[in-house]
């Protein structure tokens, strides 16, 4: 059994590498941008080159796990629709077709941004309605996967966090931590709600579903629901950071890229199938604190 982990240098990809090592699962990892260890670079903005590179790296994968993302997220997609489509749709289609030729399973991470945020909490089969290009592209790839594969796992997730001090694309709490450590103020959207998801929970749940052959579409997020401002305050209290530096933004700026402000994903479906615990907000923050303390010893 060999897992091909695409984007193994990112937060989610690194966690897959860690857990594969712990379970003695053979894996091959690729990177898209920053160098890390012996990971091989694959250009996912060049789908033709990508397919050839994957063939050379891992000709017989058991499963392909796609953790690749672009720095800048939603804003980057709106400003760079061409590269965004290549990464989030065209490369995914190539990978799906390649997986089918190899009889390999495929794991794809999607987003709460496939919804409009008007009627939470959302179940997997609720009507979608993305408000921005990022969500549209994620949904388009979801549809292609579901129409062209049998052995797939689509995990919709959101607000993924974990300790990754070296990343050039920090998650929300890492960005908050770095900003306050520099003595700067941090503007926090109190109008933006979601499910904070510790990366370890996300990856453990995905691996468990894959191991049990529970294919399909799932919501995999933390069991808590909170706005970004209160989440930031909770983190600061635990980390001993200056809470006065957190500036509460109660209204979205007029030029913000449209997005769902009330994004609550229902996890009843996945909870019935896995033993992995999806921790709530406070438990997830305690996990993060343990990681931080371990890294600075």
Regions found by a protein language model. Give the residues of each.
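N-terminal Rossmann NAD(P)H-binding glycine-rich loop of SDR-like oxidoreductase domains
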Residues: 1-23
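NAD(P)H-binding glycine-rich loop region in Rossmannoid oxidoreductase-like domains
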Residues: 44-87
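NAD(P)-cofactor binding segment of oxidoreductase domains
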Residues: 76-107, 139
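Conserved Rossmann-fold NAD(P)-dependent oxidoreductase catalytic core, especially the SDR/UDP-sugar
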Residues: 93-131
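NAD(P)-dependent short-chain dehydrogenase/reductase
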Residues: 143-194, 201
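Glycine-rich Rossmann NAD(P)(H)-binding loop
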Residues: 187-193, 218-226, 273
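Mid/C-terminal beta-alpha module of Rossmann-like enzyme folds, strongest
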Residues: 203-205, 212-255, 261, 296-297
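Amphipathic terminal alpha-helices
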Residues: 281-297
